[in-house]
Swiss-Prot record:
Family matches, as Gene3D superfamilies: Alkaline Phosphatase, subunit A
Pfam families: Sulfatase
Parts of the chain on the Cytoplasmic side: 82-110, 163-264
Annotated family: Belongs to the phosphoethanolamine transferase family.
PANTHER family linked: INNER MEMBRANE PROTEIN, PHOSPHOETHANOLAMINE TRANSFERASE OPGE-RELATED
Membrane-spanning intervals of the chain: 61-81, 111-131, 142-162, 265-285
Membrane topology field: Multi-pass membrane protein
EC number: 2.-.-.-
InterPro entries, per database record: Alkaline_phosphatase_core_sf (IPR017850), PEA_transferase (IPR040423), Sulfatase_N (IPR000917)
Localization of this protein: Cell inner membrane
A GO term for molecular function: phosphotransferase activity, phosphate group as acceptor
Keywords linked to the UniProt accession: Cell inner membrane, Cell membrane, Membrane, Transferase, Transmembrane, Transmembrane helix
Protein name stated in the entry: Putative transferase YhbX
Length: 541
């Protein structure tokens, strides 16, 4: 019998096993990191061979279940990240997953259906291979010893890596050891969740840190500052910026009271990083969560302000997330469950509190977060059909505009000001099942270009700056902008809005979902253009 005939006979007998290996290999090479691919493939194959030689069916299933489910989940996550964002899964995505609340996950299930199907298919495929006891395969002793060698070698390499890391950082981290070991296994993406867990623990350790600032407090003539942070808002869908549909009539009606930023850009295309960049001393080029305690809430508290944080983003996992590490420093925090309009009664209550203190009231909106069709009451829809994704997204913008109009109404007779900006934009590709989505690797300008303006009450008269700002201004410098807006600054930073804008305008550096730094100006304008700025053929965006 020739070698080819032997191979053909073996392939015929074990074709399902070969199929599993091929699917695992291709998926990991294309949609995941190719790092340590040999070890991962050996780990995968040898584990299957060991399990297939367990004679007891209940025991075989008991051992197989966690292996099958974890491997299928890992591959499905890789496919989702690659197909949706054009990048491999990373610790930034892992942090976003860990910070997602159950309500948000349920709302977004429709976006995940193809990948849930992939998870089910892969689970069944791997289970179909493992479930059959096969005496024709090498014995457990042989495959078990080989698997033990692979695991031992991987663990040794991981320990070496963790030791070098501990030597450099003067501290051992079990998360680094776990993360490194995961890269040698079929559960590669667990390494990112280990890194995210490490970040979570670091954040917990510094969340209660309240630095002391040398402050300069200047009277701006404003008593009430309302900071509104929008979510996933595209400038291209706002009539305030020239969009054809009337999505922002309330803000446009206040145009004479507004200082508009035409080219505001977010520092990052996802909330977990973009909001801390905007509200703390953290920066695009020197990202470090130890910068988070240097934030607008702690500054306002020390300056004698009464501070409030009102959020319609779920209170789930309130401790140990980047945004909540800032929010928790406010004197009063409120989390509502439902639409953004539920924040208005709490805003009214905050305004009615009799105090001689100035007030900083932060409203963190759900805004236009995907799926946009769930971001507003159906009774508030003005664009049809309501199941069209473009109509839904425009309705979510219109709903936020309505809320802003109500905020202006509450503040029009007060010495008050409102600053509004969105945490980041969104990509748009009409050829995709989910037309709107977060920016990924080398995102387009649409993922960063955000609305931003400062509204001044008519009571303040003409003594405030309402001129339009046409230069690029990154919200990564909003920490300084907000400080100057409140009149609460440190000696080393610009003291007025004009000085902040003059100092930081034109800085167009941004970070993508892969933590790479890019010049916003050099990015393609739209997702449906290729990296050189040319339109992509229909259906290939």
């Amino acid at each position: 019998m020739t070698v080819f005939n032997k191979f053909a006979r073996t392939f015929k007998s074990h074709w399902l096993l070969y199929l599993c290996v091929i699917v695992f290999g291709i998926t990991n090479l294309v949609a995941s990191s190719g790092a340590h691919m040999v070890q991962r493939l050996l780990f995968f194959v040898l584990t299957i061979l060991v399990v297939k030689r367990i004679s007891s069916l209940p025991l075989r299933l008991l051992v197989a279940a966690p292996f099958v489910l974890l491997t299928a989940a890992d591959m499905s996550i890789s496919l989702y990240s690659w197909c949706t964002f054009g990048t491999t899964f990373n610790d930034g995505f892992a942090i976003s997953v860990l910070q997602s609340d159950p309500d948000e996950v349920v709302k977004m299930l429709g976006m995940y259906i193809p990948y849930l199907c992939a998870f089910a298919f892969l689970s069944l495929l791997f289970l179909a291979v493992i479930i059959k006891y096969d005496v024709s395969l090498p014995t457990k002793k042989v495959t078990g010893i080989l698997l033990l060698i692979v695991i031992s070698g991987s663990l040794f390499s991981a320990c070496q890596f963790a030791y070098k890391d501990a030597k450099n950082k003067k501290a051992f981290s079990p998360y680094i050891l776990a993360s490194r070991f995961a890269t040698y296994t079929p559960f590669f993406n667990l390494n990112y969740f280990a890194l995210a867990a490490k970040e979570h623990q670091r954040l917990l350790s510094i969340a209660n840190t309240v630095p002391y600032f040398q402050l300069s407090v200047r009277d701006t003539g404003i008593d009430t500052y309302v900071l509104i942070v929008g979510e996933s808002v595209r400038v291209d869908n706002m009539s305030l910026y020239g969009y054809t549909r009337s999505t922002t009539p309330q803000v446009e009606a206040q145009r004479k009271q507004i200082k508009l930023f035409n080219q505001a850009i977010s520092g990052a295309p996802y909330t977990a990083l973009s909001v801390p960049l905007s509200l703390t001393a953290d920066s695009v080029l020197s990202h470090d969560i130890h910068n988070y305690p240097d934030n607008i809430i702690n500054m306002a508290n020390q300056a004698g302000f009464q501070t409030f944080w009102l959020s319609s983003q779920s209170a789930f996992r309130q401790n140990g997330t980047a945004v909540t590490s800032i929010a928790m420093r406010a004197m009063e925090t409120v989390y509502v469950r439902g639409f953004d309009e539920l924040l208005l009664p709490h805003l009214s209550q905050a305004l009615q509190q009799n105090t001689q203190q100035k007030k900083l009231i932060v409203l963190h909106l759900n805004g236009s977060h995907e799926p946009a069709c769930s971001a507003y009451p159906q009774s508030s829809a003005v664009f049809q059909p309501q199941d069209d994704q473009d109509a839904c997204y425009d309705n979510s913008i219109h709903y936020t505009d309505s809320l802003l109009g109500q905020v202006f109404e509450l503040l029009k007779d007060r010495r008050a000001s409102v600053m509004y900006f969105a945490d980041h934009g969104l990509e748009r590709d009409p050829t995709k099942k989910n037309v709107y989505f977060h920016g990924g690797r080398e995102a387009s300008q649409q993922a960063y270009h955000v609305p931003m303006f400062i509204w001044y009450s008519p009571v303040l008269g003409d003594g405030v700056d309402r001129t339009t700002e046409n230069n690029i201004f990154s919200t990564a410098y909003n920490n300084y902008l907000i400080n100057a807006w409140m009149g609460v600054t440190k000696p080393e930073q610009p003291q007025t809005l004009e000085e902040v804008i003059a100092h930081y305008k034109g800085d167009s550096r941004v970070v993508d979902a892969n933590h790479d730094v890019f010049d916003y100006v050099m990015l393609r304008k739209e997702f449906t253009e290729d990296k050189q700025g040319n339109p992509t053929p229909e259906g290939q965006g």
